[in-house]
Amino acid sequence: FFYFKSLCDVYKNITIKPDYPKHTSIKELELKIEEGIALGYSHIFCVIDMDTKDTEPERTQYQKLRAKYAKPIAKRKKGIYCNVEFFETHRCTELFFLYYFRYTSRAYENQESLLKDLNKSAAYQKTTDFFIKSKGLHNYFERNGGSLEKAVANANRSVEEKMKSDRDYTYSELGRLMERLESI
């Protein structure tokens, strides 16, 4: 949430929902998607941390949700046409933050080991206080020598390598998300 809010200067014509950070269940996510469709949003982008989808029943519930929204939602009588897209990162969004600085395909056993690597490039704490003090995570990472362009390139590389090797860890589709935001 805080990271995407910090991108509003880069992508001026986007609306970020929800307005607060929240770990959302699949059922809650589905309700939020339906709410966005009813509000007439043309695009709904769902950012998914896959570390919470590694086990059942979450994995199956998530796959069903993706399948449900695989095609655009069209309700012509209501004037609704909405594309719902999912963008995954395994383990978590902080991998994309690390990609601001360097590439890795290392298998992380847990979030703490990933955060330790991120902290080698820029001090980072997963706290509301830190997010506020950083005055925007995107700018904070760039002030500390990272770059969004590098993050996008590294994320795209991780997805390409994932597909070639059939691995199911350490990848981020957030590069593709940034490219989609750029195209809107």
What would you call each of these model-derived segments?
Residues 1-3:
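Short N-terminal binding/cap micro-motifs at the start of the first secondary-structure element
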